Structures are given as C-alpha cells and as structure tokens.
C-alpha cells in the first residue's frame, strides 16, 4: 500500500487521512513515515464526529478546500464507504491492493504501473 500511495502522490494526487482514532494517533504518526505522504488529516477526537457521520467527511472537505464530488474516499469498512457516498464523494471499499488499483484506474481513467 505504501508503494501505491507514493505512486499516487508522485502522479499529483493529494492524499488526506480521515480517522476515528483517539489522540493516540499522534504517537503512531511519529513511528510510521507513511503519514508523511498525507497532505492533511482529520481526526475524529478533534472534530467530535466519527465515520460514518456525514459531518466528518464534510469537515475534511471544508478544512482543505475540497469538493466532495472531486474526492475519492477509501476504507476497509462498507459503512464508512456508504457514509462518504452520502456526501457526494466517490468511494471504494478496500479489500486488496490489486482490486484497489483496478478501481483507481477505472475511476480516473489512468494506468498505474505495478
């Protein structure tokens, strides 16, 4: 997944995190450099909303000047995917990297070298 995120970043995609974690996320972020790939993040403990509540997805958009219709949300839980879709975001359920790459290629009409 890290390799894929790096490729997306190098291709000009902006990457944002949206998590239901508590403030312990900051200790995790210090340990794993994958978080440095993100252009921003919304953490539920700071926003007082959690996925799949509509407000947290919209907070991400408001905070970073994004339009829901121009966002692709990815999660490994269908309930969160449906929450994102309810805001107008395109959303994909993550099951495997291979399937995820297929979905990105389909949605954006691009080819990602594997």
Q: Across the structure, where does each feature detected by a protein language model lie?
A:
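Asp-based, Mg2+/Mn2+-dependent phosphohydrolase catalytic module
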Residues: 6, 22, 29-114
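Short, acidic loop-to-helix structural element flanking the phosphoryl-transfer center
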Residues: 1-16, 54
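Conserved phosphate-coupling serine/threonine residues in phosphotransfer and NTP-handling enzymes
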Residues: 19
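Short low-complexity stretches enriched in small and charged residues
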Residues: 1, 25-28
């Amino acid at each position: 997944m890290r390799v894929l995120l790096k490729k997306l970043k190098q291709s000009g995609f902006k990457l944002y995190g949206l998590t239901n974690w508590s403030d312990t996320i900051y200790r995790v972020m210090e340990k794993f450099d994958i978080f440095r790939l993100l252009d921003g993040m919304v953490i539920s403990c700071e926003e007082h909303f959690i996925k799949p509540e509509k407000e947290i997805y919209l907070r991400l958009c408001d905070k970073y000047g994004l339009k829901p219709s121009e966002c692709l949300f990815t999660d490994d839980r269908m309930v969160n995917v449906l929450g994102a879709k309810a805001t107008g975001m395109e959303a994909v359920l993550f099951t495997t990297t291979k399937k995820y790459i297929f979905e990105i290629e389909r949605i954006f009409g691009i080819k990602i070298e594997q």
